[in-house]
């Protein structure tokens, strides 16, 4: 399956637009990781634990997007966008939300 951020796939023609397809991944916060990320932020540098979490979340969201698109009969997803956000649970933590959205299509 082709999954791309572009609306056009060079050398391919869209036979049918099947609709919008979305996928979401939600992670709970980890107090220990948050603590060390906070220290790293104070002294400078990158927070590798969060970078890895974002990378993993994006990969999982794209995999789920592909699975849902296949169920719609698609062989490609065009115009995908990945977004991140947080959902505040309480004063002690939040959830990390990663969403992927695109248009499921059938290529000729």
From Swiss-Prot:
Q: Which HAMAP family match?
A: UPF0145 (MF_00338)
Report what the protein is called: UPF0145 protein Tery_3795
Under the heading Gene3D superfamilies, the entry gives:
Hypothetical protein apc22750. Chain B (3.30.110.70)
| SUPFAM superfamilies linked | YbjQ-like
What is the similarity comment for this entry? Belongs to the UPF0145 family.
Q: Which Pfam families match?
A: YbjQ_1
Q: Which organism is it from?
A: Trichodesmium erythraeum (strain IMS101)
Q: What InterPro entries does the entry give? A: UPF0145_dom_sf (IPR035439), UPF0145_YbjQ-like (IPR002765)
């Amino acid at each position: 399956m082709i999954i791309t951020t572009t609306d056009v796939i060079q050398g391919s023609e869209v036979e049918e637009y099947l609709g919008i397809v979305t996928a979401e991944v939600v992670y709970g916060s980890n107090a220990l990781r948050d603590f060390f990320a906070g220290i790293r932020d104070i002294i400078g540098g990158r927070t590798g634990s969060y970078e890895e979490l974002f990378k993993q979340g994006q990969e999982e969201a794209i995999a789920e997007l592909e699975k849902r698109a296949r169920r719609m009969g698609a062989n490609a997803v065009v115009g995908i966008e990945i977004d991140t956000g947080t959902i505040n649970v309480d004063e002690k933590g939040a959830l990390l939300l990663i969403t992927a959205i695109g248009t499921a299509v059938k290529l000729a």
